Every structure is written in C-alpha cells, then in structure tokens.
C-alpha cells in the first residue's frame, strides 16, 4: 500500500480524535493514550515487529496466471510467503524466488514460522486499485471408472421352448349348510299354452242342415197357426148357436 495513503489516514485519525476530545466525548488521557500508539509517519519499507518475528504462509487453492507486470503466478498447492496484505482482496507475497501480487481468495492460510535472519529484500510496492478476481469455476471431472452397463435379460436359444409353470389348482370352497337358505328353489318355468287352430266347418253340410231346420220350422208354424185358428173358429160357432 502507498505510504502517502497510510500517512493521510493517520492524519485523519488524529483530527477525529481531537474533535472527540473537544466535544468532551473522550478525555485528555484517552486522547494521549491513543495518540501515543499511532506512529508519527509510516515508511512503506518498514514492517511491524510482529511480522519481523514471524512469517505467514498461505497455500494456493487454484491456478492463477499473471495478468500484468507485478503479478505473481500461482499453481495449486504452492506455498506463498505473505509479505504484505495490501487489501482484503490482494496480497503481496513471495513464491519460487519471485515476488508479486496475487488475489487473496485464491489462497488459504497454511502456517506461520519464526523468521530467519536474512537480508531485507527491497521490493517497492505501488498503489494497487483493481477489482477482486473471483475463483475459477471448475467443471466436474469425468469419472475414471467406466459406467456400468446394464445387462440385457437372458434370452433362451432358438428352438428351445420353456414349459409353462404348473398352475396351482385351487381347492373348492366348502358348500354352505342348508339352513342358511343359500340354495334357492329353482323357478318353475311354465310353457305358454299352445294355440289350437280353429276348425273350419264344412260349408256344404252346415248350409244343408240350416235349410232343413228352416223348412221344418215353417211347417210347424203353419200347423200351429192352422190348429189354433180352427179351435177359435169352432168356439165362436158354438157360442152363436
């Protein structure tokens, strides 16, 4: 990070502390305590005492190709010494005897160890202002194992006829007892009466018989009329005499 930006932030913090002191938000003792902890001026090449005693290492999770001068290319599994955390998204570190900037979301914390005495490496850092790089998206690797083939059902050879399985004969159900009225009386079927064809009378015989009866009746009628008339007439004659 640029030294000018850090020194500007320190100046802003002191101004804010003075404003809080004048507003009676903090006391003079607190102001002096906080102000004494702040450095007067920050140099970009100096490191904090904690960083001088320990070295922080991170491990690369993804491959990263340098996009411009000053970037540090990474390979998955590389161990990188963190020299400076420029921002939450970008770190400056050393790996494979190279120093550069790499995205913070491409690494994970690995370990820390005590720093060995060695000469300070001069590496000027410029102001970095660029967007964060999202981790690469990997497609799922193809399975190394061959897919299991579904075996086809067994087909008998040609000309071979498999006998059907024997059918199980079901035992007959027991007949219910007679008192349950389960057995119904068979309905009697009546045959319709046969129609007899009417007997046709012989026209000649009937006509002859009817004519005979008519002639016989007319004779009887004439005889009766004649007999009655003669009897009445005799009575009248007798009454006159």
Swiss-Prot record:
Effect upon mutating residue 90 to S: Abolishes interaction with LAS17, but not with SUP35. Blocks colocalization with actin
Biased composition (Low complexity): 118-131, 180-213
Function: Involved in resistance to EDTA.
Motif mapping: PY motif: 135-138
GO cellular component assignments: actin cortical patch; cytoplasm; nucleus
Domain SH3: 53-112
Pfam families, per the entry: SH3_1
Entry keyword set: Acetylation, Cytoplasm, Cytoskeleton, Isopeptide bond, Nucleus, Phosphoprotein, SH3 domain, Ubl conjugation
Modified residues (Phosphoserine): 48, 114, 116
Covalent cross-link Glycyl lysine isopeptide (Lys-Gly) (interchain with G-Cter in ubiquitin), where: 41, 79, 118, 219
Family recorded in the similarity comment: Belongs to the LSB1 family.
Residue ranges crossing the lipid bilayer per the database entry: none
Annotated localization: Cytoplasm; Nucleus; Cytoplasm, Cytoskeleton, Actin patch
Record PTM N-acetylserine, positions in chain: 2
Naturally occurring in which organism (per UniProt): Saccharomyces cerevisiae (strain ATCC 204508 / S288c) (Baker's yeast)
Gene Ontology annotations of biological process type: negative regulation of Arp2/3 complex-mediated actin nucleation
Gene coding for it: LSB1
Domain-level remarks: The PY motif is recognized directly by the WW domains of RSP5.
Protein name, as recorded: LAS seventeen-binding protein 1
Assembly, per entry: Interacts with LAS17, RSP5 and SUP35.
Residue stretches of biased makeup (Pro residues): 163-179
Residue span of region Disordered: 118-213
PTM remark: Ubiquitinated by RSP5.
SUPFAM superfamilies registered for this protein in UniProt: SH3-domain
